[in-house]
C-alpha cells in the first residue's frame, strides 16, 4: 500500500461514519454549522451573493481536486524511486551519482534564469520593518487577541517575569513586587537605551528628567541638557511637551516608547518618573490553521474561521477573568502621537496578520463533494480569503492591511510544481471573490526537502505574490529523515542541528531570498525558539538570526516577541542583507543533499535508551493533549521538566527518528514499546494536576492517545512524508465520537 493509499483509506473510513447535518450548496454537501456561519455572517458583510459563492466554490474544488491528487501521487512516486535507489546503493553514498539520479527522476529541477520577484502592495511591516513574528493557534480567541495586540509590549514586564534577569543577590521574583529585582530591570533598560538610542555625552542612567525642547528630545542632568546622538531617533510624544506622558524613539525602523508617570509605583521610584519602556514587538503574526491547532471537523474549522473573521472586522472579543476581575479583551486601537514636526503621528496598534492555511495533503469532512471529503487546503484558501475581506476595506478603522493585501502562509509544499498549484488556486479564489489579481500574497514555508533544493524555482512560481519565505527546521528535519529513510540510520536528534545539511539549508534560504529580490518586498524568516521559559538563553542566542540576514524570526509568546525585538534594534538587518548580497551566493546544494546518516551506529545501550526515552516522552506529552483535549500547540515538559513549545512539527521529528532507528535495527520495536510504557507513567505524573486528564498507564490499550503514539512510530515509514496529521486526525475524531 502506498503512502497516499494509506491516507485515502483513513479518509474513507472517516467519511463512512459521518453523521454531520449537511446543506446542499453548489452541489457540495456542506456541514450546516459551517454553511450557516458563511452564509449568514460572512457573505452579507462582504457583499458576496451566496448562490454565486457556493457554486463558484464548488467549481474550484471540482476543477482543482484532480491536480491536487496528481501532486500527491507524484510525491509517492518520487519517494518510491528514492527508496529503491538507497536499497540498491547501500553503504557510502556517491554524492555525484546521487545528484544525477535526483535530476533524472525530476526531483531536482533546472534553476530558473536570473530574475527577481515582482510583488507589489505589501505593507511596510513586511517590506521595510525587521522584527519578531508570532505564531498562534486560531482556535483560541484569547491567544489570537493577545498575539494581535502584541505589536507593543512592556520591556519591564518581559524582563521582570522571566529568567532574563537572574534570581540572584536578592532579585527573586516572589509573590510581591521585589524592588531589588525591579532595580535590575531598570538598569537593564537603561543599558539598552544607551546601546540603541545613546545620548551625546551622557548616559540614560544619569538622566533626571526627559522632555521636549525645540522639537527635540531633551535629557536633563543637573543644569545640563543632552541630546540624542542620532537626532532622527526622536519621533514624537504624548501629553505636554514640557512634562510628556510618553516619548517615542526609533532605531532600525522599530519604535521605543518611554512611558513617564511619576505617580505610578515604578515611576515614583525612578528619578525621571519613567514607569516603563514599551517596545514595538510582534510586527507580524501568523494566525494558524495548521500545525498548532487540532481542527478535525466542521465545528473546529468553523470556530477558526469565525475567529479569523472577527480579527479582520476588528470585532473579535473575549470575556476573561484575572485575579477575580472579569474584563473584555478586544483589539487595540492605533497609537497617536504629536510628531516631531508638530503634526499628528499615527502608528499601528496591532500586529499585521498572516493566516496559515493547511498544506496540500489533508482532506476534511466539513464539506463533501460527490461523497468525498474536500481537500482542506482548497477549502482554507476560499474561506480564509472571504473572511479576510473586511481586513482590507479602507473604511474599516481596524483593518489589517493598509495596502489591500491578504497574506496567506502555505506550508508543506514539495517543490515548484506544488507552489505553482497554490498560485493557480489563489488566482481562482481572487476571481471568485472579484478581488484584483495578486491581492492574495503567499508566504512559502521552506520546510520540505524538495522545496529547499529547488527554492529559486519555487520562489519564481509565485514571483508576483510572494510575501515571505521562512525556514522551518523542525518539519524540514522530519522530511529529511523520511525522504532518506532507506539510506541508513540517522544521527541522533540533537546532532541534526550541526549536520552539514542544516547550516547549508539556512544559508541557502537567505541567499536565495536576497538573490531573488525579496528585501524591500518580502520577508526572509527563520524558525521558532521553542524553550518558552528560557528567555535569558534566547536573548543570548536568537540574535544570531538577524545577524544571518533574517528580517523576521518566530517567537513563542508576546513576552518572547518583546525580548527578541531588542535584537532588531541592535542589528540593522537590511544592512546585513546588503553585505550578503555583495559577498555573493554561497554554494549550498551539495551540503543540503548530504544525508545525515550516522557514520556508525555503535551508540552505547544507555545512549540508545536516552534517545528512545526523550523521543517517546516528547511524543506522548504532545499527543495526549492533541487527541484527548484538542490542543494542537502547548508547553510540554520534556524528560528533564523543561517546558518546550510543541506542535506537529516537533512530533514529526520524534516519530520519524524512532521509525528510522527501528527500520535499521538500531533499536527494536519491543524496546521502543517498553520506553513508551515507561514514559507514559512520566507524562501521567506531569499532568497529575489537570482534572480533565486521563492517565495512559497502566491500561495502555484503552488509551487512544497511547495508541496514536504507537501508530505514529510503528507506521512512521508508511505515513505520507512522515506527516503526523492522518493518524492524529483519525484518533481525535475517534475520541470525539466516543466522548
UniProtKB/Swiss-Prot annotation:
Q: What is its EC number?
A: 2.3.3.9
Its pathway? Carbohydrate metabolism; glyoxylate cycle; (S)-malate from isocitrate: step 2/2
Q: Which InterPro entries match?
A: Malate_synth_C_sf, Malate_synth_sf, Malate_synthase_TIM, Malate_synthG, MS_C, MS_N, MS_N_TIM-barrel_dom, MSG_insertion
Cofactor dependence is on:
Mg(2+)
Q: Name one GO molecular function term.
A: malate synthase activity
Keywords associated with the record: Cytoplasm, Glyoxylate bypass, Magnesium, Metal-binding, Oxidation, Transferase, Tricarboxylic acid cycle
Q: Where is this region: Disordered?
A: 1-23
Task: Specify the inducers.
Answer: Activated by RamA and repressed by RamB.
Residues annotated to bind acetyl-CoA: 135, 142-143, 292, 329, 556
Q: Which stretches does UniProt call biased (Polar residues)?
A: 1-18
Residues bound to Mg(2+) are 447, 475
Question: What activity regulation does UniProt give?
Answer: Inhibited by oxalate, glycolate and ATP.
Any idea which residues bear Cysteine sulfenic acid (-SOH) here?
633
Which Gene Ontology BP terms does the record give? glyoxylate catabolic process; glyoxylate cycle; tricarboxylic acid cycle
Where, by residue number, does glyoxylate bind?
A: 356, 447, 472-475
Co-factor binding details: Mg(2+). Co(2+) or Mn(2+) could partially replace magnesium.
What are the subcellular locations of this protein? Cytoplasm
Domain of life according to the entry: Bacteria
Instruction: Report, from the record, the phenotype seen after gene disruption.
Output: Cells lacking this gene show the absence of malate synthase activity and to the inability to grow on acetate.
What family is this protein classified in? Answer: Belongs to the malate synthase family. GlcB subfamily.
Q: Please describe what this protein does.
A: Involved in the glycolate utilization. Catalyzes the condensation and subsequent hydrolysis of acetyl-coenzyme A (acetyl-CoA) and glyoxylate to form malate and CoA.
Q: Which HAMAP family does the annotation name?
A: Malate_synth_G
The family database entries (NCBIfam families) matched by this protein are listed as:
malate_syn_G, PRK02999.1
Q: Can you state the subunit structure given in the record?
A: Monomer.
Protein's name according to its UniProt entry: Malate synthase G
Write down the species: Corynebacterium glutamicum (strain ATCC 13032 / DSM 20300 / JCM 1318 / BCRC 11384 / CCUG 27702 / LMG 3730 / NBRC 12168 / NCIMB 10025 / NRRL B-2784 / 534)
